[in-house]
């Protein structure tokens, strides 16, 4: 009897393993039909999925190419683009209830759906046809059973409504809103929570540079930071049509291309916008008009919102009689940056109105050009760096001192900022008199730390925690220059207290053994899944739990990682790409792309580095199919 039970147990175990293996194989390689019929096409389009989830589209016309882009966006990214559309239309409460109704109210107060629809109607006819072609392909994908059975849509029991051409402009507006600077959050107090809910923020930490390798060949590197979203935010697409070959880094649901290259140029455009401000005016000085928007409630009822607006001015409040506090934002008017994004494909330039349009481009000749007016422009060997925060100046300094290399030095973990600050602070602290052996050990680690934020660094953890406690206690970082002699005693005492607090925190969170205080454990990368991050009672909560990845890097190092010293929400999610000039020769990408429907994917990802792959059209496709006109 015991032997029979053992045999049955082994058979059951074997059957379970086979089932799991089949599930892994089938889910990891869902093969579309060999031929998919679509209305709106004039000729067949060949679709190839290359290694790294890169998509190659071979079309005979630009119109067919945009239909295909819409189709692959819908097939590969249905859940995030539908969620973003629901947010952009101010209809999240219909899906998720009253708790997100304030977000819908914000969207309708800013009139995003209304102005997006008006902006579409104001576009030139050829541009409208591009959006119409894109929506045809996207709707075709959204009607497929494979998309309807996507796990998130099934688990949340969400309906799929048709995609209207102007919906892409609503998403463009939503992203421009999320990209506004934190300084506007006081005027729009719901904006920061909306960013957190969608996990899209931190765009100001994006950076780009061009440097020269040892063979005098320019290398164009760019990094786009976009919050803590665990889902892919970008989709790389190779478009071949009408004798043109264009690499595009696209955002699903939109025709925004933050990165790309044609045969004549490559570009990086930051998803940032500083085109908003608050002002105070006498009421009579503005031609204010009443405007109304309907806010739909989960019950099906509607609430009428009343605002006052004059062109790009929206009244926020009336602090005193006859005086209004207003928000000025171009997104309040029926405009779009679509023409500026499309101009990149034909090597032309056009002005941006919603986004800043700042970034960097390089021509096939090797000539570089700064786009817009980024706040940081620094010379580096054989090129320049453009960025948006003071941290980026330290990146430029580090690039100036590194030896020339054919590879982008984005794996460098050394911080000039930390090295300089540590030297000064240890000089001010001088000697440490304490009987606490753990504080003594921490002090020894600081004195021997080389300013490197790699995974194994213990000094990095102690240093950051030390400064974070000082910042929390005194509302600022320590002065990074020698103060007057009369203030040094006070500063030394303050640094001592902060170090005591830091060690107490590390002891409590990571234990008494400093060898466990490694940077990878103290500050892991935490990537989140929309909705599940805030609704722990949903089905499949374990599958969509946060991804915790080993921490490495810092805002002041070439390897990016958030810091507890930043006053904003940590933004570990990022996409990196680099191109060897002349454009069109070699294009490499590094990013995360979790696939939760694969067996043990969560645990496989934890042991993997960022995936690096080449955007090479000659790569052997993993799968292929054809989009053909529907007769």
Language-model features: where?
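C-terminal/peripheral segments of proteins
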Residues: 2-631
């Amino acid at each position: 009897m015991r032997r029979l039970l053992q045999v049955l147990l082994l058979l059951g175990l074997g059957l379970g393993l086979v089932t799991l293996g089949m599930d892994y194989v089938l889910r990891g390689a869902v093969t579309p039909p060999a031929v998919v019929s679509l209305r709106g096409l004039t000729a067949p389009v060949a679709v190839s999925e290359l290694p790294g989830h890169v998509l190659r589209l071979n079309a005979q016309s630009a119109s067919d190419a945009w239909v295909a882009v819409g189709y692959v966006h819908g097939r590969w990214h249905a859940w995030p683009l539908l969620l973003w559309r629901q947010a952009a239309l101010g209809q999240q409460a219909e899906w998720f209830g009253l708790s997100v109704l304030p977000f819908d109210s914000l969207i309708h107060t800013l009139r995003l759906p209304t102005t997006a629809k008006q902006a579409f109607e104001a576009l030139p006819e050829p541009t409208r046809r591009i959006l119409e072609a894109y929506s045809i392909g996207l709707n075709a994908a959204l009607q497929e059973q494979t998309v309807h059975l996507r796990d998130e849509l099934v688990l949340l029991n969400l309906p799929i409504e048709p995609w209207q051409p102007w919906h892409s402009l609503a998403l463009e507006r939503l992203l421009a809103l999320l990209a506004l600077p934190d300084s506007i959050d006081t005027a729009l107090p719901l904006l920061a929570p909306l960013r957190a809910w969608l996990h899209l923020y931190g765009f100001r930490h994006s950076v780009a540079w061009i440097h020269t390798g040892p063979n005098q060949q320019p290398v164009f590197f760019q990094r786009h930071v976009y919050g803590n979203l665990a889902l892919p935010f970008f989709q790389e697409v190779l478009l071949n049509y009408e004798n043109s070959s264009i690499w595009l880094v696209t955002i699903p649901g939109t025709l925004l291309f933050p990165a790309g290259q044609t045969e004549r140029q490559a570009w990086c455009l930051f998803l940032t916008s500083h085109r908003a401000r608050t002002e105070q005016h006498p009421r009579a000085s503005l031609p204010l008009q009443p405007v109304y928007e309907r806010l739909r409630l989960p019950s099906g009822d509607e609430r009428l919102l009343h605002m006052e607006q004059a062109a790009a001015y929206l009244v926020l409040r009336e602090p005193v009689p006859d005086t209004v506090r207003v928000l000025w934002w171009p997104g309040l008017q029926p405009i779009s940056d679509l023409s500026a994004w499309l101009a990149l494909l034909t090597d032309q330039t056009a002005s941006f109105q919603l986004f800043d349009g700042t970034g960097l481009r390089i021509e096939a000749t090797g000539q570089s050009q700064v786009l817009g007016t980024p706040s940081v422009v620094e010379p580096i060997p054989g090129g320049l760096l453009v960025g948006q925060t003071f941290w980026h100046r330290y990146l430029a300094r580090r690039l100036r001192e590194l030896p020339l290399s054919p590879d982008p030095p984005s794996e460098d973990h050394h911080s000039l900022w930390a090295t300089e600050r540590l030297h000064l602070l240890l000089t001010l602290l001088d000697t440490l008199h304490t009987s606490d052996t753990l504080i003594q050990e921490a002090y020894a680690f600081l004195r021997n730390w080389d300013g490197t934020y790699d995974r194994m660094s213990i000094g990095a953890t102690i240093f950051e925690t030390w400064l974070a406690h000082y910042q929390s206690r005194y509302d600022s970082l320590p002065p990074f220059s020698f103060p007057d002699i009369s203030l040094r005693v006070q500063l030394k005492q303050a640094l001592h207290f902060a170090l005591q607090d830091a060690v107490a925190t590390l002891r409590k969170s990571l234990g008494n053994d400093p060898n466990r205080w490694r940077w990878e454990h103290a500050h892991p990368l935490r990537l989140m899944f929309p909705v599940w991050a805030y609704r722990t009672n949903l089905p499949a909560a374990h599958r969509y739990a946060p991804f915790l990845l080993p921490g490495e890097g810092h805002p002041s190092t070439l390897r990016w990682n958030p810091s507890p010293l930043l006053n904003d929400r940590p933004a570990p999610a990022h996409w990196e790409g680099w191109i060897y000039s002349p454009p069109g020769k070699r294009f490499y990408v590094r990013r995360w792309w979790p696939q939760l429907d694969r067996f043990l994917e969560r645990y496989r990802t934890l042991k993997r580095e960022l995936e690096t792959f080449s955007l090479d059209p000659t790569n052997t496709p993993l799968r292929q199919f054809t989009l053909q006109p529907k007769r």
